[in-house]
Amino acid sequence: MIGKLKGVVDSYGEDFVILDVHGVGYEVHCSARTLQRLPPAGEATDLAIETVVREDMIRLYGFRSDAEREWFRLLQTVQGVGTRVALGLLSVLEPAELATAIATGDKGAVARAPGVGPRLAARLVAELKDKAPAFAPVDPALVRLAGAVEARTAPQPVADAISALVNLGYPQAQASAAVAAALQSAGAEAEAKTLIRLGLRELAR
């Protein structure tokens, strides 16, 4: 199996790059994020590779990091997630963002990926929630805060601040992370307006 390719970018397709390795052109399918970060044609690059072998084809998938490749593999352990959906998820969320979204139960962020509806998003969160921290570090305080919000046991100012940030268009996981950071600086007795202000400052960094 091919585990890594290093060569010169020959050309790009809609969802793949042709990588010239010593005169052999390899068609490597990538997430939109990975394709955006690759250099223009004629420049050298390298990709971690996942080789998928099926009865009628052999297809290569490329990643900028081993973490992205590990998530590609992990996502496909969930029923209903194939290579296309896995790449779609990695196109809208970085590995660390994906880990945080799943660990905090942010089904809305997961459902932003093409081909992921509410039911599949819920299944991804349910099946991978305990595995996510092993693939990317997730702040335990953030997980506890998300759990408290979901269980409606979080202090009202915290819940109000997170709700306000979500209403402004921020994903649930980002809003929770920002409010968690705001709590650390403002203290547990902070009012919602203070948490919102500090949370927005955190999100603007």
Curated annotation (Swiss-Prot):
It is found in: Cytoplasm. Residues 144-152 are annotated as: Flexible linker. Residues 1-64 are annotated as: Domain I. It comes from the Bacteria. Residues 65-143 are annotated as: Domain II. One of its GO terms (molecular function) is ATP binding. Residues 153-205 are annotated as: Domain III. Has three domains with a flexible linker between the domains II and III and assumes an 'L' shape. Domain III is highly mobile and contacts RuvB. Belongs to the RuvA family. NCBIfam families: ruvA. This is Holliday junction branch migration complex subunit RuvA. It comes from Methylobacterium sp. (strain 4-46). The gene is ruvA.
